[in-house]
From Swiss-Prot:
Residues 182-192, 290-300 have a biased composition (Pro residues). Residues 421-624, 1006-1158 are annotated as: Interaction with MAPK1 and MAPK3. Residues 383-540 form the F5/8 type C domain. It comes from Homo sapiens. The keyword Secreted applies. Residues 116-166, 252-266 have a biased composition (Basic residues). Residues 41-387, 1108-1141 are annotated as: Disordered. Residues 390-555 are annotated as: Required for DNA-binding and interaction with NFKBIA. This is Adipocyte enhancer-binding protein 1. It is linked to Ehlers-Danlos syndrome, classic-like, 2: A variant form of Ehlers-Danlos syndrome, a connective tissue disorder. EDSCLL2 patients show severe joint and skin laxity, osteoporosis affecting the hips and spine, osteoarthritis, soft redundant skin that can be acrogeria-like, delayed wound healing with abnormal atrophic scarring, and shoulder, hip, knee, and ankle dislocations.
Length: 1158
């Protein structure tokens, strides 16, 4: 009876235990059932399921009843069933979990609570969810345990079958399993998982992605929170959690949130037997999961612990496909590859493969990954960095240091690549850095002032015609503070770099691996001669753009073609510009070079191909030396700029193009450029490509017209016999066998064809503006004496410098300053000269003869042979700058180039015509005070560049009467209109008559001389009266000298008259400066009159004059001169030859002044 009475009590206790969440009555209620289940389950499972048995729940036979029990009271039966189920679940999962995975589990899982799927013992709802997965299995074994609550635990084993890691766990092994659970919890945020109760629902969702399972899981989450058992983790999941940090694990949770597709991926992959082996350790962890619950969510690549349904409840802004983008921002490249590769292997999502295909390639196969790696490694080839700016002087002098220097002229600042020696060697400007002694501790250091990736060094020997010094081997060191230095090694020892074998050829020494540092040092090891070297450093700046030293750096804003152009590229670019702007551009050729390459020119004007009346013509030329390529590239950039800005409506460019005819010639020496381009920007020496193919220097191969002009000026032939402008070319220079380059002949023909007004040639190697004269003129004795006296007084030698100046010196200086002041670097005085001292004094301009005197230059020839004022622009120290320097150089020169072109509209302009309006060509326009004129063009128009001011301008032409007027020039851009109308004269007829008479000279008739007989008689009387007065004066002087005593020294008399001659103003105070008789002094003043009469009378007596002139000359000489007058005339002629002294009075009016002064 006691046993009978105790039965209901035991059943009640069991029910209470089942209701308690923390209770573990499973052993009491399910011992028999577990043993029966194990007998059948172990017989079916292979050795592998033994591991799963730890986690797998009991067989799924009681699933139908469990559903009813759950419907009646889920909370009460769940704990009890959970305790009974785990042993049976493990058996059923091992057998049928693989066969019946997805379809049945979701239905039963919906009925049960979401937690028990992985923890069969504690969570009956898991069994309820999983028995659906294995209803056939449960049907086999439900007969064994239909009456008992064991049916509910049988419902759990089917879930465990689909989720083998989470379902199988016998009660006996549970304590041992708890030791394994603590491993995964630390990396996972357990506290967040507990409230979510991800155990059952996550496992069910993982096994069956059906929507019903998710819905029920969410509904039952609050109830099973107390009984929650965390799902078993796959061994791979545990490793992943240990490898990655918490923030990375969180990102994984965010990624799977939106995509349900990824949930299905692990479900299909992980039910395989290998996955069942992994969960074996996980069941041990089930005991502790309530204390340290592990988040079921795992990376979408792994299926055991991947709890996506719980993350659906959480909000993440990163979608499943886009998770790669946030990873790209947070993760490194290695982390991205590690996370992406497993995703592709396990899940192989189409979205990810598509992204990789778009970025790296189209193949979705595994070899594609190898290809991606190859593409990533290809850019790791040797980085080619540009020069840091040693040659171009971007590296300032204070950034270069050395251990010592031989003397001041051989300091570290002279150690730049292609540095040239001064005018004389052994001065303060020599051609290299030389150390003080031959010790091997010498070094030269460069500070880049920013973090730089160094890739190589270019070395060169000393520039000298006497010494042969260069470094053959050297070491390289790097530092970030100039205190601690690290030598470049090859892995075993300090790496030795091989230098030069001669003093001129640059040699590149590349670093096998780039080095990032701020300072670089060169330690010479061996050398030839003295320890001297020049160098350039190759490096890329890695400092941020906002660095201190980069704040003021120039950055190009124009979208132009910044690269070096070969001959074909140049021709193609000019063609493209012409196609873009066909209405304002025209391409033509000046001629051909000695190798047959055409010298192309680009014309930019609103009416290309024609000279418009009143429109000045301007020219820019470059490439006159083949290795000076900066000007070549600047003109190509200028073509593009003018074309694009004109199309875009830039008012400044439109005004310039519409009012000016611009000619741009980028390469006057195409043969030389091809030679220089073969060596590149840094490896051609100073002279490679400078000359033409025939060996001519185009800049100095023009006719020497300076000597012709200066010789005529010394003979006083200018401007009557020799003009001061438009001098003709000597015939010897034009002969076919003359040694003149082909390019120069083409340039001269081009100059004569177009009426250029202003021009400039762009050169390199220096940083200044040079203006004529380029040829030095030997100063006269007076100028040398004045210069010596000025030097003694400490004044400037202006007298000597004036000998090198042109008549338009002030205008040339204005033009030079207009370019230099608009240039960004020419007027910076701290930069100094490139090769020697700064001849410009910080102004950026210099007279060519004072700086570098040369003969036969293009500037002097253009000034003396044409109307064009031409200057030379030396744009930089580096003749052949690197391609990376072009944007900066364009910004430095752009404004200056435009400003100089606008100067062509300064001064005066106009048209010279006759009274009928017919234009007069070759008329001369002269300006008072400027001994240099200009000629009118074929249309009668002219342009004269003048500084602001007021000028007296005269226009004269052969056969026309000269005309003069006053013209004002303002400071504003815009020439003053100053037209001339010339009237015809009879000089043309006179010259024809003279030609008929043998071109004899025509006597000049002074208009002030008397023409009538009465006037001539009156003049004779006046002359006779003056002669009498002079005779009386001479007698008085003679009497005064004779009355002196013997003690008086006669030589003292001559100096006294000399003083009176210079100081007295009254006419009668003059005394002849010499001791000659009074006749000599008198005839000196009177000689001019009598000689003029004689020159005019001699043709009357000796030759027969034409009838036309007889009527003019006969009345003049009707009256015969008196005999005394004729005798005096002959005496005066003889005395004039003897004395050689003559006063400047040459007219009759002068005679009256002489007599009055006398």
């Amino acid at each position: 009876m006691a046993a009978v009475r105790g039965a209901p009590l035991l059943s009640c206790l069991l029910a209470l235990l089942a209701l308690c969440p923390g209770g573990r009555p499973q052993t009491v209620l399910t011992d028999d059932e577990i043993e029966e289940f194990l007998e059948g389950f172990l017989s079916e499972l292979e050795p592998e399921p033994r591991e799963d048995d730890v986690e797998a729940p009991p067989p799924p036979e009681p699933t139908p009843r469990v559903r009813k029990a759950q419907a009646g009271g889920k909370p009460g039966k769940r704990p009890g069933t959970a305790a009974e189920v785990p042993p049976e679940k493990t058996k059923d999962k091992g057998k049928k979990g693989k066969k019946d995975k997805g379809p049945k589990v979701p239905k039963e899982s919906l009925e049960g609570s979401p937690r028990p799927p992985k923890k069969g013992k504690e969570k009956p709802p898991k069994a309820t969810k999983k028995p659906k997965e294995k209803p056939p299995k449960a049907t086999k074994k439900p007969k064994e345990k239909p009456p008992k609550a064991t049916k509910k635990p049988k419902e759990k084993p089917p879930k465990a079958t689909k989720k083998p890691p989470s379902g199988k766990r016998p009660p006996i092994l549970a304590p041992s399993e708890t030791l394994e659970w603590p491993l995964p919890p630390p990396p996972s945020p357990g506290p967040e998982e507990l409230p979510q109760e991800g155990g059952a629902p996550l496992s069910n969702n993982w096994q069956n992605p059906g929507e019903e399972t998710h819905v029920e899981a969410r509904e039952h989450q609050p109830e099973p929170e107390e009984e929650t058992e965390q799902p078993t983790l796959d061994y791979n999941d545990q490793i992943e959690r240990e490898d990655y940090e918490d923030f990375e694990y969180i990102r994984r949770q965010k990624q799977p949130r939106p995509p349900p597709s990824r949930r299905r991926r692990p479900e299909r992959v992980w039910p395989e037997p290998p996955e069942e082996k992994a969960p074996a350790p996980a069941p041990e962890e089930r005991i502790e999961p309530p204390v340290k619950p592990l988040l079921p969510p795992l990376p979408p690549d792994y299926g055991d612990g991947y709890v996506i349904p719980n993350y659906d409840d959480m909000d993440y802004y990163f979608g499943p496909p886009p998770p790669q983008k946030p990873d790209a921002e947070r993760q490194t490249d290695e982390e991205k590859e590690e996370l992406k590769k497993p995703k592709k292997e396990d899940s192989s999502p189409k979205e990810e493969t598509d992204k990789w295909a778009v970025e790296k390639g189209k193949d979705h196969k595994e070899p594609r990954k190898g290809e991606e790696l190859e593409e990533e490694w290809t850019p790791t080839e040797k980085v080619k960095c540009p020069p840091i700016g040693m040659e171009s002087h971007r590296i300032e002098d204070n950034q270069i240091r050395a251990s010592s220097m031989l003397r001041h002229g051989l300091g570290a600042q002279r150690g730049r690549l292609n540095m040239q020696t001064g005018a004389t060697e052994d001065d303060y400007y020599d051609g290299a850095w030389c150390a003080e002694d031959d010790a091997r501790t010498q070094w030269i250091e460069v500070d880049t002032r920013r973090t730089t990736r160094f890739t190589g060094v270019i070395t060169q020997g000393r520039d000298s015609s006497i010494h042969d010094d260069f470094v053959t081997t050297f070491f390289v060191g790097f530092s970030n503070d100039s205190q601690t230095w690290v030598m470049y090694t090859n892995g075993y020892e300090e790496m030795t770099f091989h230098g030069n074998v001669d003093k001129d050829t640059p040699v590149l020494s590349e670093l096998p691996e780039p080095v990032v540092a701020r300072f670089i040092r060169i330690y010479p090891l061996t050398w030839n001669g003295s320890l001297c070297m020049r160098l350039e450093v190759l490096g890329c700046s890695v400092a941020p753009v906002y660095s201190y030293y980069a704040q003021n750096e120039v950055v190009a804003t124009d979208d132009l073609d910044f690269r070096h152009h070969s001959y074909k590229d140049m021709r193609q670019l000019m063609k493209v510009v012409n196609e873009e702007c066909p209405t304002i551009t025209r391409t033509y050729s000046l001629g051909k070079s000695s190798r047959g390459l055409k010298i192309y020119a680009m014309e930019i004007s609103d009416n290309p191909g024609e000279h418009e009346l009143g429109e000045p013509e301007f020219r820019y030329t470059a490439g006159i030396h083949g290795n000076e390529v900066l000007g070549r590239e600047l003109l190509l950039l200028l073509m593009q700029y003018l074309c694009r800005e004109y199309r875009d409506g830039n008012p400044r460019v439109r005004s310039l193009v519409q009012d000016t005819r611009i000619h741009l010639v980028p390469s006057l020496n195409p043969d030389g450029y091809e030679v220089a381009a073969q060596m590149g920007s840094e490896f051609g020496n100073w002279a490679l490509g400078l000359w033409t193919e025939e060996g001519f220097d185009i800049f100095e191969d023009f006719p020497d017209l300076n000597s012709v002009l200066w010789g005529a000026e010394e003979r006083k032939w200018v401007p009557y016999r020799v003009p001061n402008n438009n001098l003709p070319i000597p015939e010897r220079y034009l002969s076919p066998d003359a040694t003149v380059s082909t390019e120069v002949r083409a340039i001269i023909a081009w100059m004569e064809k177009n009426p250029f007004v202003l021009g400039a040639n762009l050169n390199g190697g220096e940083r200044l503006v040079s203006y004529p004269y380029d040829m030095a003129r030997t100063p006269t004795q007076e100028q040398l004496l004045a210069a010596a006296m000025a030097a003694a007084r400490g004044e400037d030698e202006d007298e000597v410098s004036e000998a090198q100046e042109t008549p338009d010196h002030a205008i040339f200086r204005w033009l030079a300053i207009s370019f230099a002041s608009a240039h960004l670097t020419l007027t910076e005085p701290y930069r100094g000269g490139c090769q020697a001292q700064d001849y410009t004094g910080g102004m950026g301009i210099v007279n060519g003869a004072k700086w570098n005197p040369r003969t036969g230059t293009i500037n002097d020839f253009s000034y003396l042979h044409t109307n064009c004022l031409e200057l030379s622009f030396y744009l930089g120290c580096d003749k052949f700058p690197h391609e990376s320097e072009l944007p900066r150089e364009w910004e430095n020169n752009k404004e200056a180039l435009l400003t100089f072109m606008e100067q062509v509209h300064r001064g005066i302009k106009g048209v010279v015509t006759d009274e009928q309006g017919i234009p007069i060509a070759n008329a001369t326009i002269s300006v008072s005070g400027i001994n240099h004129g200009v000629k009118t063009a074929s249309g009668g128009d002219y342009w004269r560049i003048l500084n602001p001011g007021e000028y007296r301008v005269t226009a004269h032409a052969e056969g026309y009467t000269p005309s003069a007027k006053t013209c004002n020039v303002d400071y504003d851009i815009g020439a003053t209109q100053c037209n001339f109308i010339l009237a015809r004269s009879n000089w043309k007829r006179i010259r024809e008559i003279m030609a008929m008479n043998g071109n004899r000279p025509i006597p000049h008739i002074d208009p002030s001389r008397p023409m009538t007989p009465q006037q001539r008689r009156l003049q004779q009387r006046r002359l006779q009266h003056r002669l009498r007065l002079r005779a009386q004066m001479r007698l008085r002087r003679l009497n005064a000298t004779t009355t002196l005593g013997p003690h008086t020294v006669p030589p003292t008399l001559p100096p006294a008259p000399a003083t009176t001659l210079s100081t007295t103003i009254e006419p009668w105070g003059l005394i002849p400066p010499t001791t000659a008789g009074w006749e000599e002094s008198e005839t000196e003043t009177y000689t001019e009159v009598v000689t003029e009469f004689g020159t005019e009378v001699e043709p009357e007596f000796g030759t027969k004059v034409e009838p036309e002139f007889e009527t003019q000359l006969e009345p003049e000489f009707e009256t015969q001169l008196e005999p005394e007058f004729e005798e005096e005339e002959e005496e005066e002629k003889e005395e004039e030859i003897a004395t050689g002294q003559a006063f400047p009075f040459t007219t009759v009016e002068t005679y009256t002044v002489n007599f009055g002064d006398f």
